[in-house]
């Protein structure tokens, strides 16, 4: 089966690098599915789960807090603002971040504070959703 080179990187580290049969991630306009031979594309990505079906058939999951996706004929590159391997996601930390963001939202004094709190809340909610999706998938295996 055809494969495509996939790299997921954040400012801190390279999270994934390898060959994949399929990549799914939250694009700006909705969920994107990328197969080998996909049309070249550059777009922003929303906070959420990146699912990579590796060449071996194993699935890798990475949570990204937004970023940029570049698709070229033989490569997919995800440049993430922040990226966390699926196995490293922590529901308690994500829930605490959600609560802090909601509290900050309630106490926002300026438009900048409000926008920052909304962004933090969206990221925390996306992380919790990614954790739930990953738990469901793991439950099927």
UniProtKB/Swiss-Prot annotation:
Coiled coil: none
Keywords from the UniProt entry: ATP synthesis, Cell inner membrane, Cell membrane, CF(1), Hydrogen ion transport, Ion transport, Membrane, Transport
Any matching Pfam family: ATP-synt_DE
Major place of residence: membrane
Superkingdom: Bacteria
GO CC field: plasma membrane; proton-transporting ATP synthase complex
Cystine pairs: none
Record keyword ATP-binding present: no
Matching CDD domains: F1-ATPase_delta
Keyword Transport: yes
InterPro entries, per the entry: ATP_F1_dsu/esu_C_sf, ATP_synth_F1_dsu/esu, ATP_synth_F1_dsu/esu_N, ATP_synth_F1_esu_C, ATPsynth_dsu/esu_N
Record membrane topology: Peripheral membrane protein
Alphabetized GO MF terms: ATP binding; proton-transporting ATP synthase activity, rotational mechanism
Intracellular or extracellular location(s): Cell inner membrane
Function: Produces ATP from ADP in the presence of a proton gradient across the membrane.
Family per record: Belongs to the ATPase epsilon chain family.
NCBIfam families, per database record: ATP_synt_epsi (TIGR01216), PRK00571.1-4 (NF001847)
Subunit structure: F-type ATPases have 2 components, CF(1) - the catalytic core - and CF(0) - the membrane proton channel. CF(1) has five subunits: alpha(3), beta(3), gamma(1), delta(1), epsilon(1). CF(0) has three main subunits: a, b and c.
Name listed for the protein in its UniProt record: ATP synthase epsilon chain
């Amino acid at each position: 089966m055809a494969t495509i080179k996939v790299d997921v990187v954040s400012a801190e580290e390279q999270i994934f690098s390898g060959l994949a049969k399929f990549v799914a991630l939250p694009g700006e306009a909705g969920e994107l599915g990328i197969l080998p031979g996909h049309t070249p594309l550059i777009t922003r990505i929303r906070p959420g789960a990146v699912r990579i079906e590796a060449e071996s058939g194993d699935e890798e999951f990475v949570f990204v807090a937004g970023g940029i996706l570049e698709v070229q004929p033989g490569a997919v590159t995800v440049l993430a603002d922040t990226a966390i391997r699926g196995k490293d996601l922590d529901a308690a930390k994500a829930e605490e971040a959600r609560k802090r963001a909601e509290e900050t939202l309630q106490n926002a004094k300026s438009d900048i504070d409000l926008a920052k709190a909304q962004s933090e809340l969206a990221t925390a909610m996306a992380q919790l959703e990614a954790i739930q999706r990953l738990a469901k998938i793991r439950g099927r295996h």
